[in-house]
Amino acid sequence: MELKGLSKTIGLLVLTLLFFASAQQSNAQTVCSNQTGTNNGFFYSFFLSSGSACMTLTGNFGGGNYSTTWSLGSSGDMVAGKGWNPGSTTKVVGYNTGNFSPGSNGYLALYGWSTSPLVEYYVVDSHGPFTPPGGGAQSLGTVSTDGGTYNIYKVSKSGPNILGNGPFTQYWSVRTSNRSQGVNNTITFNNHVRAWASHGMNLGTMNYQIMATEGFGSNGSSNVTTWQISN
């Protein structure tokens, strides 16, 4: 009788685990075309200029998990991630990369936009062999935060943006050494905001803000989980 009871208990446990695994899988969503939306309580954004790329959104690890794969040819660009809309200048973000394989040119960054002024910003924590932002950037010193040093850059751009097409400015903080994978990391965004402001680089009204994977002219993949530590 005891063995029969144990067998029933094990059987129920297996069925329960299968149910939760199935429910978790049912929350998965694959995106391969330009769009924004919500998934498991997080805002997401996916942009692809050319080439091939997809993002899979899941409910794993509190809902902030996503993975990407990309093959972008020589000039394709992909920006994909999960986060918040609107973002916040004081947000403290946690994240963990189960995988970040950027190929020849890819970044892992806290990424977003503001309007009035129209600004695209990056806090790059890891990147591939190519170090962003590349030519034409104005170097404006450094900021030390979250256990590392970041180089600050400002770039004037013109092209597609969240308001259409036209001029905008990029603000960059690029960490001098890549973050470790498979561990919990923190980005204290306000430390970058204050450092940028000291160089006259002010943000306006916050638009979306994501923990992003970007690939440019490369092949790669990522698996990222993000969460909010404080707003």
Report each predicted region and the residues it spans.
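Bacterial N-terminal signal peptides
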Residues: 11-21
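N-terminal segment immediately downstream of the Sec signal-peptide cleavage site
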Residues: 29-81
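Extracellular-facing segments of soluble proteins and assemblies that are Gly/Ser/Thr-biased and enriched
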Residues: 78-145
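Short, flexible beta-strand-to-coil junctions
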Residues: 97-104, 113-116, 177, 210-221
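An exposed acidic His-Trp-rich patch
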Residues: 116-181
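Long, compositionally biased interface segments
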Residues: 182-231
